[in-house]
């Protein structure tokens, strides 16, 4: 599942749920037994790399064609018109990624390896090891800082995924603030899940308010 949003006609944002992007190795600190080669799900290296290939192709396909570059001089051969007018998204928010290893494989060992994405991610206390991440184009977003916002658990509840916050300088020298979150699922029904989702929304609102308190025209 994904959506694409164009901001100010020059930045492209995409959100993509990776739907359990786990590697094939066991993390002794996490409950990732479902996603191992010997598990009932049979999460083999072949299935893992096929998933990475599909995700990378999806991200590339969600880019856009910059018609302003078509027919201009190619940097490799000034006498030849450029045909390289396809731009991948400037930002890709990813949900349900396990660790830095899978992000390295996605950005450096898949169809995205020539795209030059950098990334930041959370390290949440989620029992399964599920996190969120942000891929970004360094040419569009010069990272200033990133951090995880820990969700304060409600009484008698399990830890959930952190919110990822990142700020950076964009092309017009403004500072852009980005939040990536994956709210608790509605498993168990709307009434059961609503308090958890409201807790996440409340902490997100608090973080946004703190930015606006310092700059009421901040770009978020």
How would you name each of these model-derived features?
Residues 11, 87-90, 117, 176, ...:
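Residue-level recognition of the N-termini of beta-strands and the immediately preceding loop/turn
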Residues 22-23, 152-154, 185-188:
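A short local loop/turn or secondary-structure capping micro-motif enriched for an aromatic residue
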């Amino acid at each position: 599942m994904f959506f694409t949003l164009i901001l100010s006609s020059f930045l492209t944002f995409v959100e993509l749920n990776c739907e359990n992007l786990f590697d094939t190795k066991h993390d002794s600190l996490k409950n990732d037994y479902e996603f191992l080669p010997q598990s009932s799900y049979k999460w083999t290296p072949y299935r893992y790399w096929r998933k990475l290939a599909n995700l990378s192709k999806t991200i590339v396909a969600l880019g856009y064609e910059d018609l302003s570059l078509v027919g201009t001089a190619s940097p490799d051969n000034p006498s030849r018109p450029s045909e390289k007018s396809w731009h991948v998204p400037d930002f890709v928010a990813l949900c349900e990624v396990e660790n830095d290893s899978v992000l390295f494989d996605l950005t450096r060992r898949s169809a995205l390896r020539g795209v030059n994405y950098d990334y930041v991610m959370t390290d949440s206390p989620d029992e399964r090891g599920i996190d969120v991440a942000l891929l970004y184009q360094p040419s569009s977003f010069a990272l200033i800082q990133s951090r995880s916002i820990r969700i304060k658990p409600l009484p008698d509840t399990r830890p959930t995924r952190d919110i990822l916050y990142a700020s950076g300088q964009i092309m017009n020298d403004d500072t852009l603030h980005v939040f990536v979150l994956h709210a608790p699922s509605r498993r168990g029904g709307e009434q059961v899940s609503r308090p958890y989702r409201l807790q996440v929304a409340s902490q997100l609102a608090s973080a946004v308010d703190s930015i606006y308190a310092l700059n009421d025209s901040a770009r978020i």
